[in-house]
């Protein structure tokens, strides 16, 4: 078996383009790029690194983002007040709903400039430009603006500079490759169960770009341009929405057939394969296989990393555990090789389940996770509350955010010996919060009538 150090060294060689210049690493980047195993940094060392990372990011946004500085002044907090990790609860948190409160047209560009830390590049906005037109103009000028969670008809827009986005892409790749050790190797085949990163501004697709550098041959489930207005139209229950859904339904049947044929080919050849992305797509593939009495036994040659979206239909959820058992039964992929990942468009820290107990491990060298009650106070260990985080990697927008997700957090994993805090395996939306996440959004757009039920 390959040594872990050699394994990560090979990964870094493949992902070289994502590295910032070594003489200009921020403290958060040091915690991600320099750590050999981001989930096994000793607690004292991780705490010191995280303090430096969050303090640096907070000072940066306080000094360079006038909107956030005003927010801090309203809360009577300055960077000088953050003297230790114990002071992190003083850092003002931005509600995730804030990133949905934008106007359209030229005012949308001005809203992005308000959220953005630093100076946005200048672009020319035309009268008929939609959100994607404006985003693409900014992205051509050097940014990587992406969006998610249009499930209420309002997307979450996050403006990243290229460096912050590269940090996010590297972080997600390193977190996954570390957790599946020793499974990963470049000479293998992958299937991305998300939109093509190079044809969409949907975050969950776009952030998977490193998959194409880490694995030699990748196929994409949704290999077409996917724009904000199409997603919104498909979710509306009018004639246009129904026509779009009907066209997508026909395309989805072909998509399932393509994935099954791909599996047959690589199973026959004894190839190593991986799936990354929305679980509901693979769920429908497995349903089709089971219906036809077809089973595979990929064993250690197969791995699955899912990203949220555990509603299969509007009236049916599947549990993470149920999904793992189904993958083991139909694809022959061991449950240890079937991991879930938790992340969001607003953040650059990604939590991946450990193979031993399937708890979500938090990358604690650059990312402070918190669980808070309705009054903004931290709850006791293991109690349910809202997930909030301080993201040291976010340099182009203030990544100090309270989400609408309900979680339980523990200081250490009850099953494995990795020294990071963990979240319980299932993350749910808090009562009164809309269903969020790119996988849920893709389900709403694409899963309509794929075997029953309505989205």
Task: Place the predicted regions along the sequence by residue.
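Conserved AMP-binding/adenylate-forming
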Residues: 302, 310-413
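Ser/Thr-glycine-rich phosphate-binding loops at phosphate-binding pockets of nucleotides
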Residues: 145-155, 344-347, 403
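Long, K/E/R/D-enriched contiguous segments that form extended
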Residues: 269, 298-299
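Conserved ATP-binding/catalytic segment of the ANL
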Residues: 388-455
């Amino acid at each position: 078996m390959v040594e872990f150090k050699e394994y990560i060294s090979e990964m870094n060689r493949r992902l070289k383009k994502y590295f910032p210049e070594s003489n200009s690493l921020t403290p958060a980047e040091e915690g991600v790029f320099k750590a050999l195993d981001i989930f096994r940094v000793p607690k004292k060392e991780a705490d010191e690194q995280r303090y430096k990372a969050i303090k640096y990011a907070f000072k940066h946004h306080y000094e360079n983002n006038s909107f956030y500085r005003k927010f801090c002044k309203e809360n009577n907090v300055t960077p000088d007040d953050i003297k230790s990790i114990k002071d992190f609860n003083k850092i003002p948190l931005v509600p995730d709903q804030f990133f949905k409160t934008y106007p359209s047209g030229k005012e949308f560009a001005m809203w992005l400039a308000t959220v953005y830390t630093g100076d946005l590049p200048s672009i020319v906005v035309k009268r008929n430009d939609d959100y994607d037109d404006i985003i693409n103009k900014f992205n051509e000028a050097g940014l990587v603006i992406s969006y998610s969670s249009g499930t209420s008809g309002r997307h979450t827009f996050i403006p990243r500079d290229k460096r912050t986005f590269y940090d996010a892409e590297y972080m997600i790749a390193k977190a996954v490759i570390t957790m599946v050790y020793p499974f990963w190797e470049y000479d293998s085949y992958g299937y991305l169960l998300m939109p093509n990163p190079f044809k969409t501004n949907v975050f969950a697709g776009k952030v998977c770009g490193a998959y194409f550098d880490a694995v030699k041959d990748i196929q994409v489930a949704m290999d077409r341009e996917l724009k904000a207005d199409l997603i919104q139209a498909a979710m509306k229950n009018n004639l246009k929405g129904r026509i779009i859904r009907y066209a997508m339904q026909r395309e989805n049947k072909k998509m399932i057939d393509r994935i099954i044929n791909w599996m047959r080919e690589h199973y026959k050849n004894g190839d190593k394969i991986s799936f990354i992305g929305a679980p509901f797509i693979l769920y429908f593939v497995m349903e089709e296989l089971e219906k036809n009495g077809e089973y595979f036994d990929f064993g250690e040659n197969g791995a699955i990393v899912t990203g949220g979206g555990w509603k299969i239909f509007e009236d049916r959820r599947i549990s993470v555990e149920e999904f793992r058992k189904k993958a083991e039964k139909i694809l022959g992929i061991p449950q240890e090789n079937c991991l879930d990942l938790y992340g969001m468009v607003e953040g650059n820290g990604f939590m991946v389940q450990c193979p031993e107990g399937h708890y979500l491990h938090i990358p604690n060298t650059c990312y402070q996770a918190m669980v808070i009650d309705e009054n903004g106070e931290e709850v006791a260990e293991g109690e349910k509350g809202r997930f909030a985080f301080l993201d040291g990697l976010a340099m182009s927008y203030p990544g100090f955010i309270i989400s609408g997700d309900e979680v339980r957090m523990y200081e250490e994993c009850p099953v494995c010996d990795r020294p990071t805090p963990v979240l319980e395996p299932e993350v749910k939306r808090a009562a009164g919060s809309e269903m969020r996440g790119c996988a849920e959004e893709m389900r709403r757009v694409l899963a309509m009538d794929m075997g029953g039920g309505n989205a």
